[in-house]
Amino acid sequence: TSAAQTKAFSRFHAAVNVGSLPSTLVGAWLRLHYGLPVAFAAAGGATLLAVAALLVGWRSLRPSEDDAIARALSAAPSDATEAVAAEAPARWGRVAVLCIGAALFFVALQQQQTTMLVWAKEKLHMDAPETVSSLNPLCVLLLALTPLSGWASSLRLRLVLAQVAIGAAFALLLVGEHSASPLWLCGWYVLATVGEVLLYPLGMGLVVSLVPRRHAALAMSLWLLSLSLGSKGAGLLAAAGVDVAVRASLAICAAGAIWFAVALSEWTALTHRLRLTLL
């Protein structure tokens, strides 16, 4: 994946969090003052508005000239397309590797919706602990202004560092487990968001670029499946208690870092071969 593509997905990721920031605050306020039914109704209404905006704006979307050229070229077989087809199993294998590693990462990251809220309620005695979730989109938007969001010097290094960053976030909680200071929680969100910014846009770009364009939707579905599996794992860990979840997440992050470091050891060679076949 190119640096430009990584920056494009970083902007998409930041745009999503533009909506996440106010929604976490408004949702928590509605739940606290009017109850869960009103909060869920507001979320449903906002979703309908988003779908309506998408449908209205859909008519303005037009296929780009590059898409038309790509369709025309794909109609005629060539040595390049045959070479790319021969690489298909290896590329789908790399997609699977990325999604497995991402699932391990998301098990830890999605603790922000479970374990971190329990931690805030028990340690900080907050009436609306959901408000701390706004720290995540806020950090995403701030980090989007830094070179970190578009940095792609080494793919494997970036993915490993993402796991290390969120692992450090849980290590920070272990250090401050007997403290009631909100700074520990803020530190967790900052480190976890650094990991998210390193991995999420790059991962989306990689799974899309590794497969033919006609299979991009399927590859993205696998990526989102890894997010869903991570959320399920986060829920299971949260049910075991804060202490268990924090320690287990730290171990999972270590496993994810090792997974990326080992499984992507031939990543450079593979991407080099793919570029040669596309020249």
Protein language model regions, located:
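Alpha-helical transmembrane segments of multi-pass secondary-active solute transporters
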Residues: 8, 38-43, 158, 219, ...
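Glycine-rich segments within core transmembrane alpha-helices of 12-TM secondary carriers
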Residues: 6-32, 44-50, 133-137, 220-235
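Intracellular loop-helix junctions on the cytosolic face of multi-pass helical membrane proteins
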Residues: 2-6, 10, 22, 27-127, ...
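Intracellular juxtamembrane helix-capping segments at the cytosolic ends
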Residues: 1, 197-212
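Transmembrane alpha-helices of Major Facilitator/SLC transporters
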Residues: 129-152, 162-170
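C-terminal transmembrane helical hairpin of 12-TM major facilitator-type secondary transporters
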Residues: 159-199
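Small-residue-rich segments within alpha-helical transmembrane domains of MFS-like 12-TM solute carriers
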Residues: 21, 110, 193-201
